[in-house]
Amino acid sequence: MTADTPSWPEVLSALLARRDLTEAEAAWAMHQIMSGEATDAQIAAFAVALRAKGESAEEVSGLSSVMLALAAPVPPIGEALDIVGSGGDRAHTVNISTMAAIVAAATGVVVAKHGNRAASSACGSADLLEALGVAIDLDGAGVARCIERAGIGFCFAPVFHPSLRYAAVARREIGIPTVFNFLGPLTNPARPTASAVGVADPRMAPVVAGVLARRGMRALVFRGDDGLDELTVTTTSTVWVVRDGSVQEVAFDPRAVGIEPADTAALRGADARHNAAVARAVLSGERGPIRDAVLLNAAAGLTAFDTPRPDQLVDQISAAMTRCAAAIDTGKAAQLLDAWVEASQAARGVDADRS
């Protein structure tokens, strides 16, 4: 394959031969897709062949770099954190990462969350935030205003990645998870400097960690050993600690930070209205397994932001959980949500005036 001018037959032949693409080759394919040059057949063949071979960190880096380059911009926001899950665990839990993001922001860390509506559950992060009263359809300037006024903002994926529409038909018609399902956590247009990322697919979790390491980010990538795309409270989790361009895999047991195991059923959610009521209850201090899960994942975010250390992970998460619990119990988390709702609605009004 010629590095300067790859072609679809060359790219697809390489994947069928189970050869990893270079970052540049993967980037070429993604640019073809997101510019509308690729046909539905080419997109479907690429996604399926890549999935069958197994995605590499270099390939996913190429794909995600093109998405970020073509994304609608967000004004620079400095050091920031994202807490996000890949979805796809089919467990239909409440929106743990979204609640965790609010709690983390209430401790004083700037949070820039990136998300979408539900794909495989009844309620995605965008659905929950909308039910809570947050204006989700803001442009980059609106997101930045929310961060300035409330310390947290939300980038709604369809607003910032409109070129993904070119892959929509192929993704829908092949009907199986592909690399596109894992690009969301890697393509936050606000470009946070730290991430806590839950990945349900055991094959993709270390790949996601590898992509973040290649970017020089600080991150915790994790998968519950029960299959959840969260740091789970039902059993142990596997964690990939990302710092200084490297990845180290460690095991994490929630009992080490004082959490007694719960059943997955205790975390189950429903539609956006139900999950919004749960979120307000947790942010107002309600105790139980959902609070434990929210504290644990918010603490993972703070640990990633503060630079994670594999040999001190339990101590770091334990200390961060104390900060997160205080943010809830002092009322700061509930107050932050109210401030975010107000800031987002005001920003929506500014957007409307500009248009």
UniProtKB/Swiss-Prot annotation:
Signal peptide: none annotated. InterPro entries: Anthranilate_Pribosyl_Tfrase (IPR005940), Glycosyl_Trfase_fam3 (IPR000312), Glycosyl_Trfase_fam3_N_dom (IPR017459), Glycosyl_Trfase_fam3_N_dom_sf (IPR036320), Nuc_phospho_transferase (IPR035902). Pfam families: Glycos_trans_3N (PF02885), Glycos_transf_3 (PF00591). Pathway: Amino-acid biosynthesis; L-tryptophan biosynthesis; L-tryptophan from chorismate: step 2/5. Keywords: Amino-acid biosynthesis, Aromatic amino acid biosynthesis, Glycosyltransferase, Magnesium, Metal-binding, Transferase, Tryptophan biosynthesis. Mg(2+) 1 binds at S97, E230. Anthranilate 1 binds at G85, N116. Its cofactor is Mg(2+). One of its GO terms (biological process) is L-tryptophan biosynthetic process. Anthranilate 2 binds at R171. It comes from the Bacteria. GO terms for molecular function: anthranilate phosphoribosyltransferase activity; magnesium ion binding. Its EC number is 2.4.2.18. SUPFAM superfamilies: Nucleoside phosphorylase/phosphoribosyltransferase catalytic domain (SSF52418), Nucleoside phosphorylase/phosphoribosyltransferase N-terminal domain (SSF47648). Binds 2 magnesium ions per monomer. NCBIfam families: trpD. Homodimer. Belongs to the anthranilate phosphoribosyltransferase family. Catalyzes the transfer of the phosphoribosyl group of 5-phosphorylribose-1-pyrophosphate (PRPP) to anthranilate to yield N-(5'-phosphoribosyl)-anthranilate (PRA). This is Anthranilate phosphoribosyltransferase. It comes from Acidothermus cellulolyticus (strain ATCC 43068 / DSM 8971 / 11B).
